[in-house]
Structure formats: C-alpha cells, structure tokens
Regions:
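Conserved small/polar residues in nucleotide/adenosyl-binding loops
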Residues: 138-140
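Extreme N-terminal "head/tail" segments of very large remodeling/mechanoenzyme assemblies
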Residues: 1-118
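A short, sequence-level motif marking secondary-structure junctions
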Residues: 103-108, 123-129
Length: 140
C-alpha cells in the first residue's frame, strides 16, 4: 500500500508564490474542506474555488507529469507569477521513502529514494520516462 505523506505546491494553478503544504501523515484519513472567502465566507456551505481539485491535479502532476483534468502543462503555472512552479510529493511504499519534485519555468524533475537522488535523463526538458520507470517498478 502507498502512503502519501505530504504534498507541497508553489505557483501551481491558483496557489501563488508562497509554498503551500498538505500533510497527509497525521491520521488514517485526511479530510479537505475549504471556505470560499470570495463569496463572503458565510454559512451557505460554498466550497467551490477553494483548491480541492488543485490538490488532486498536483498529485497527478507530481506522479505523471500532467494534471488529472484536461489542462495543458503550461497552463498549470500560476498566471500571476508565470514562473517557478514546483510540486513536491513525498510518499512511502513498503517502508521505503520516495519523493518526486516536478516543476516548470524552469523545468525541474527529481526523484529520490530514501533521500538519495536518482539519476534522471533529459531533466532540462522535464522528460518523465525515467521517473515513470521508477514508479512502474514500485507499482504506481
């Protein structure tokens, strides 16, 4: 079983230049709720536009190099800052720690096993083949 430990994002979709983190390592279950302050933050129960889908897209982007939804990679970069997008996913499988760092503008692709960086190919182009090979080996 895979245990997602944490996810950090910067300049990804609606997340700006200040790094935001979601820690999944606290309990067996993580519930993500949001309060849309743009709509007054009242008791109407409005949960749209608070970043829940951004979390799912960031998980997909970290693992597979593309959002789960049909968004082009360049459109994942926060439009206000237009650079420095970085998504970091830290997870564990069978007692082994893994970390994937993936970003654009500039392109970043790093893969770590037990905090040891693995050699990547064509990192400057954000090529995900080697990362996908590693992920396939651990059955993700």
């Amino acid at each position: 079983m895979i245990k997602i430990k944490d996810l950090t994002v910067r300049n990804f979709m609606s997340v700006g230049n200040q790094t935001q983190a979601v820690n999944f390592n606290r309990e067996q279950l993580t519930l993500v709720l949001g309060e849309n302050l743009d709509q007054g933050g009242d008791d109407s129960g409005s949960r749209n536009g608070t970043g829940k889908t951004t979390i799912i897209n960031a998980l997909s982007y970290a693992l597979y190099g593309q959002a789960l939804t049909n968004i082009k990679r360049n459109n994942l970069i926060n439009k206000t800052n237009s650079k420095g997008m970085l998504v970091t996913l830290h997870f564990e499988k069978n007692g082994v720690d893994y970390r994937v760092e993936r970003g654009r503008s500039p392109n970043v692709l790093k893969f770590f096993v037990d905090e040891q960086e693995q050699e990547m190919t064509d990192e400057s182009q954000g090529d995900s083949r080697k990362t996908q090979e590693y992920l396939s080996l651990i059955h993700i």
